């Protein structure tokens, strides 16, 4: 965790124009291992498609973090997501990583709340930093910048492998119809 920031900071000092993760003006950092940029996509299955091809080339030391923002609605949603990943990808390791907050007065709060929505006092936001959860305020500057840039996966609007295949099949049929290889159903019925 500290290396991703420390090396990027040293590289930026030595080579001011070097490309690091994040955006112009951000605190420099590198993503861990060969992860996608943290703001690459909201579609978890698009990210999995890319990472599956890459992470299966390694013999160890890889993990796909499914940063979810708030927790999933229930255990069935989590089980369904895990099943889809297990049945459609060869990734050796993956995590479901929701963000949560803790208020000294009101306890556990789902999602990111720097201020408690119940009592209005300061709350601690916890998220996964590599392999474990820690309060975001205790992270180094580079990891905090990574957290700020992080796009969480939108599970509801992500296109599962099954949905992608259906879309592909429908598009293929339309292309065949347009090429005159197959008559449209309405014309065939007439």
Tell where the protein language model's regions lie, with residue ranges:
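Long, C-terminal-biased catalytic regions of enzyme "large/alpha" subunits
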Residues: 1-190
């Amino acid at each position: 965790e500290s290396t991703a920031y420390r090396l990027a900071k040293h590289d930026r000092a030595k080579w001011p124009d070097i490309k690091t993760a994040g955006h112009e003006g951000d605190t420099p950092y590198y993503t861990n291992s060969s992860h996608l940029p943290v703001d690459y996509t909201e579609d978890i299955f698009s990210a999995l498609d890319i990472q599956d091809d890459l992470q299966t080339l390694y013999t160890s030391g890889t993990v796909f973090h499914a940063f979810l923002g708030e927790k999933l609605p229930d255990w069935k949603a989590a089980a369904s997501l895990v099943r889809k990943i297990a049945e459609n990808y060869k990734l050796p390791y993956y995590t479901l990583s929701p963000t949560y907050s803790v208020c000294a007065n009101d306890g556990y709060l789902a999602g990111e709340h720097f201020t408690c929505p119940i009592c209005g006092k300061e709350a601690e936001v916890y998220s996964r930093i590599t392999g474990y959860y820690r309060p975001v305020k205790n992270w180094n500057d580079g990891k905090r910048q990574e957290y700020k840039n992080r796009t969480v996966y939108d599970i509801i609007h992500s296109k599962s492998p099954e949905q992608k295949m259906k879309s592909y099949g429908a598009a293929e049929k339309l292309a065949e119809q347009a090429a005159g290889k197959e008559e449209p159903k309405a014309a065939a019925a007439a």
